[in-house]
Amino acid sequence: MLSSSEKKVLRGEAQLLRPRVKVGKQGLPEGVIEEIESALSRDKLIKVRFEGDRDQITEWITEILEKTAAQLVGRVGKTASFYREKEGEERE
């Protein structure tokens, strides 16, 4: 688990990122989950842009967290940032 100070640092880093994955009104088909998995494996910290209402976005974020073992770093409007450490690697 990330501490609140670690999340704060990651949120700052995430501000400079562009969304890597866009989740449209079709939701989270397996292909989108695979794309998120791939982006997390490559970059550790990613941004995802959602198209939907607030409740639907919250459900999608929960599903992403469950399926990818990532951690939510922050959410602003329709964009959320996720972080996942690489296997065997620890954050400084």
Would you name each region that the model predicts?
Residues 1-92:
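Positively charged, polar, low-complexity stretches
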